[in-house]
Amino acid sequence: MTNTPSDQPLKQVNQRGAARLAAVQALYQMDVGGTGVLEIVAEYEEHRLGKELDGDTYLRADASWFRSIVAGVVRDQRKLDPLIGSALQDDWALSRLDSTVRAILRAGTFEILERKDVPVPVIVTEYVEIAKAFFQDEEPKLVNAVLDRIAKQVRGDQRK
């Protein structure tokens, strides 16, 4: 008897990865719509994380990881933005970037700075994959390059 795809157990969703994606979406929503952090976190926890909304079921996510990223980015934005700006090419300003790219870079930079327990390659890979979910080519490369520069600046060559 052969296993068909429906006979095989489903791979467990990476709940931190889902939290990162939700955090990027929430940060984007805050940037574009001017929604406050408390309101957006409550909305995601009540209606989105692991829930069905408008016929779509959102991935189960680590809610505390989600909260940590969103609240941390909002709290530390004045520290994060100059760091991101210094990692961009000379002729690029953070304000010129797409709102989604800004959200991805802010969340990734926050994790590089604050989550020393997570290896840099994991953080960079996760946020590059998020960029690939929204963009084709240049933006994921930009996310990779900028987060890599920030990681080297903040954590040195250890890449851990």
Curated annotation (Swiss-Prot):
It comes from the Bacteria. Transmembrane segments: none annotated. One of its GO terms (cellular component) is cytosol. GO terms for biological process: DNA-templated transcription termination; transcription antitermination. InterPro entries: NusB-like_sf, NusB_fam, NusB_RsmB_TIM44. One of its GO terms (molecular function) is RNA binding. Keywords: RNA-binding, Transcription, Transcription antitermination, Transcription regulation. SUPFAM superfamilies: NusB-like. Involved in transcription antitermination. Required for transcription of ribosomal RNA (rRNA) genes. Binds specifically to the boxA antiterminator sequence of the ribosomal RNA (rrn) operons. NCBIfam families: nusB. PANTHER family: ANTITERMINATION NUSB DOMAIN-CONTAINING PROTEIN, N UTILIZATION SUBSTANCE PROTEIN B-RELATED. Belongs to the NusB family. This is Transcription antitermination protein NusB. It comes from Rhizobium meliloti (strain 1021). The gene is nusB.
